[in-house]
UniProtKB/Swiss-Prot annotation:
Statement: the UniProt record of this protein carries the keyword Transmembrane helix: yes
InterPro entries, A to Z: DUF2489
Superkingdom of this protein's organism: Bacteria
Transmembrane segments: 7-24
Keywords: Membrane, Transmembrane, Transmembrane helix
Places the protein is found: Membrane
GO cellular component: membrane
Pfam family, one: DUF2489
Record-given protein name: Uncharacterized protein HI_0725
Membrane topology designation: Single-pass membrane protein
């Protein structure tokens, strides 16, 4: 009688061990997939930052739009524009300006007033922003997600 309990216990322990091994393998695969997804996200974010910064340097992207986009792209890295004073100053000027549909709802005079404020801020900070973009392009090579 004791042998029957021993055999049943042995089968149970063996079954549970095999199940635990299977779960550990699944966990390992899941961790690898998460690491790969995180790495792909880092690559995609860095590429986006690189494209926008280069477009700002070449004039394909206006500076105010660029700093708005860069601010959002730097957040997942735990970074902001404070390391780049001219870009941070321009961001402070344009961050509350309406965009897209909200901008369309403004009267023409108000739009022109905001455009003038934005363009004068861009002109004021342009030289320094162009210099800071080179620094940013170097900095993004070494940053990682938080």
């Amino acid at each position: 009688m004791i042998w029957i309990f021993f055999v049943i216990a042995l089968f149970l322990v063996t079954g549970l061990t095999l199940y635990a091994i299977r779960l550990l393998k699944q966990l390992k695969v899941q961790k690898e997939l998460i690491a790969k997804a995180k790495n792909n996200r880092v690559i995609r974010l860095k590429e986006s930052i690189d494209i926008i910064a280069r477009a700002m340097q070449s004039g394909e992207c206006n500076l105010s739009e660029g700093v708005m986009r860069l601010t959002m792209l730097l957040r997942p890295f735990g970074k902001n524009l404070s390391s780049y004073p001219a870009m941070a100053n321009l961001y402070e000027v344009v961050r509350d300006m309406p965009t897209h549909d909200d901008r369309k709802l403004l009267e023409k005079r108000e739009r022109m007033r905001l455009d003038l404020a934005r363009e004068s801020a861009e002109a004021q900070f342009e030289k320094n922003i162009k210099q800071e973009l080179y620094i940013l392009l170097e900095d993004i090579k070494s940053i990682e997600l938080i």
